[in-house]
Amino acid sequence: MRRLLAAAVLAAIVAAACGSAGQDLSPTGSTSPATTRASDILVLGGADRTTVIDASGRVVMDLGHVIGAPGWRTAFAIEIDNAGNTAVRVIDARTGQTTRAMQLTGRWAPVAEYGNAPSGLSPSGRWLVLGDPRPDRTAFQIIDTSGAVQPKRIDIPGRYSFDAVADNGESLYLVERLQGTQYRVRVADVPSGSLVPGSIIDVKQITTADQNGVMNGSYTTATAGPNGDWYFSVYQHPTKGPYIHALNTSARIAECILDLPTFGNAGAVEMAKQPFWSLALGKQQLTSRLYAVNGALGQLALVDPYEIKVKQLATFKVPAPSSKPAAFTPQSGAAVSPDGYRLYVLGESGIFLIDTIDLSLRATFATGAAFRGLAVSPDNATLYALAADGRSVAVLDARTGRPATTLQLASAADSIAIQKP
């Protein structure tokens, strides 16, 4: 299983587009009389900064290089002082004020390696993992961001990278990289500071792991389950196609969901559009639902996040895909409305609106335009779509797709989220 950045958790973003506080980004004129939700606060992530803007495009805050907790009310800044030691600042992302600071001896760095890699946070955001940046050793700091427990250092012999950390702070999951796309998932017991013998695999499956616990696949995306115990990742097996790896971070067990629509019969087109697989967690009334969806292929699977199995498969009409490599990789390629009844999906062009009651396609928005990220306002009324080049945000009526305005950004972003009120 690969890494968890985010947001994903659900989307925890490591950085964003730049701009100074109070700067007006001069959004383009409205293309219709549709109104926007003036109180929405957007968080834009990029390579080296995180910028907070309001619904008019005005920069509210420049947070710098931070890791965002779920909901983006809190962020964490990692800074190295002149003596070569590390300071971890806990920031109120609504005000920019530092609420707590911790000192670590030596240099420590965020564990994320890619734009959609794991942020190092547990699903609730309480535990933050930092890594030793030196390539000749493996060491991690497990930090209780509430300040109730002192940071714990763990040194692991060999070469490992971060995968996930349990919400109880007791299990640190690591990826042992082997040859090519082969890997093993291991767990370190945080209280004892030692690596637990054996690999974390689905013992019922022989398709994704051999007798030595060696798995095969490349990471695409991930999200935490409804209560923080399960962590779901999409992997692409090099010959069989995509599957979901489900890791129970509390029980230290794993299950593989192999009945995604194209697993076992993925051709050149399905392999080329692997980056468009996205996971989105939603809730209808009191029941959580997990959607695995690919907007480039028009493929959708409804997954029960409690029983860990596919409940329903569906297809929807999209422009005919080709076997050419994807021109870009969505950072948040699917989003569920807060009321749970609408699923928005990004394709290579356009935004597809899926009715979550029967998994049918209801509409296609912004036909011909390409986007890399989606966010839905808390009142279900407004849809924000980050352009594929990261330089603008389309603001749409979430029910009709009618464009309200376009926010032009001062510099390119690669992810978008809405800050919880």
For every predicted segment, state its role.
Residues 1-16:
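Sec-dependent bacterial lipoprotein signal peptides
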Residues 18-421:
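Predominantly soluble domains enriched in secretory-pathway, periplasmic, or organellar proteins
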